[in-house]
Amino acid sequence: MQVILLDKVANLGSLGDQVNVKAGYARNFLVPQGKAVPATKKNVEFFEARRAELEAKLAGVLAAAEARATKINELVSVTIASKAGDEGKLFGSIGTRDIADAVTAAGVEVAKSEVRLPNGVLRTTGDHEVHFQVHSDVFAKLNVIVVPEA
């Protein structure tokens, strides 16, 4: 099925590309999320008329994401208190939701889906480097310090 991409899609293309994808992928993912439209003659003409507007919108979203990434990088570190045993092993773990809530409380709005934990959830006290994927092209790093609760 031929579709016109309205957004950058990983491993597929960027704004304005006409690509051939499986019908189910287009019908169930790309079209409902507003990332593509079927490549009919009418849609091609409509897209060409709105191309500049869509590119400006995409640039605005990218600029906002870069601003948020800069704010995350400026935080340097966030401290999270959790119950822990004598050897620094946590009772439970600290996951993406806990980290997102702590960063949001520190003043930068972050969704839990933007938190990337390459080594899995945090299960020990100490310093941990956490990555954030704010946009498909924009990444940020933050140091999360896990301290035992008193």
Swiss-Prot record:
GO terms for cellular component: ribonucleoprotein complex; ribosome. Binds to the 23S rRNA. The gene is rplI. Keywords: Ribonucleoprotein, Ribosomal protein, RNA-binding, rRNA-binding. One of its GO terms (biological process) is translation. It comes from Yersinia enterocolitica serotype O:8 / biotype 1B (strain NCTC 13174 / 8081). PROSITE patterns: RIBOSOMAL_L9. This is Large ribosomal subunit protein bL9. Pfam families: Ribosomal_L9_C, Ribosomal_L9_N. HAMAP family: Ribosomal_bL9.
